[in-house]
Amino acid sequence: STMYVGGNFTGVKQGDKGTEISSRGLAAFDVATGDFTGQTFDFNAQVKALLALPDGRLLVGGDFTRVNGEAHSGTVVINPSTGQIDPSWDLQITNALRGGTVSVRALTYYDGNVYMGGAFTHLSGGGSSRVYARNAGRVSLSGRPDRSWNPEISGAVQAVGVSEANSAFYAGGHFTTAHGNQRAWYAAKFSTQPGAAVDTDFDFVPSSATAGKYQQTIATAGNRVYIGGSEHNLFGYDTATNQRVSGAMTFNNGGDLQATTVSAKGVIYGSCHCSDAAYQDMYVWSMNGSWSRVDEIKWVGAWDAATGESLKWTP
């Protein structure tokens, strides 16, 4: 098996004394040994998101416009067996806003479609051209955009997820409205049916009324969806009732949640720029005493995906 790492780098070196091999933006490693596989890539800008497709191909999203010398705006598909670009994926993404640049920052798969979020306005591919998809959209596994589904989110999307429990699409980011004037306050819930209707009963409440509010992680697990970001929060919501049912925050050298993933054993692992403590049952970005327990955290923490309770683990 192969593990891919994407980001903002220019090369790979095996060990401290190894020779650096040029591979810009994406690198591949053998899962069993940790060794570099030798596959090399040349992305002209940062890779932001990776998604393993059901058929084994790797979908890569990011800020790039060229990959290995070819034009690929925002996404490209890689064949993991060879490390070569899949030419059948012809999705091209544009941003028609004045001065706008394309960025695909989040990817997820659900029920035959790839859902994506970022900064863009239109999708073209698979025989369809200039499909309006404001900062979020979905495409088939062949890269054909779905013209019927456009949440029309007002600002850049940082995270996306679809819950198996309720078939709803969740997004987090730098936005406040959707579909023109409907409230979508930094995190929002949408139908996956045509029209992408906003669930107006879902009301995300940030941890601060005056400081940062943007959200940048979404993790779904059973009947819970977990939303993390600024300021310093990981909040859990019940997918059936839309009620917030758990909360954790990081202090004093705390930091915003930046990435989360759910393991096969039901553990949420979350990374943050935090090196002090995680406070359970805290919902407001203030040391006001409203918490039930405090645990050490060093850059990565673990929570029970069923309850949102801290597992008291950190590297």
Model-derived features with residue positions:
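Extracytoplasmic surface signature
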Residues: 1-315
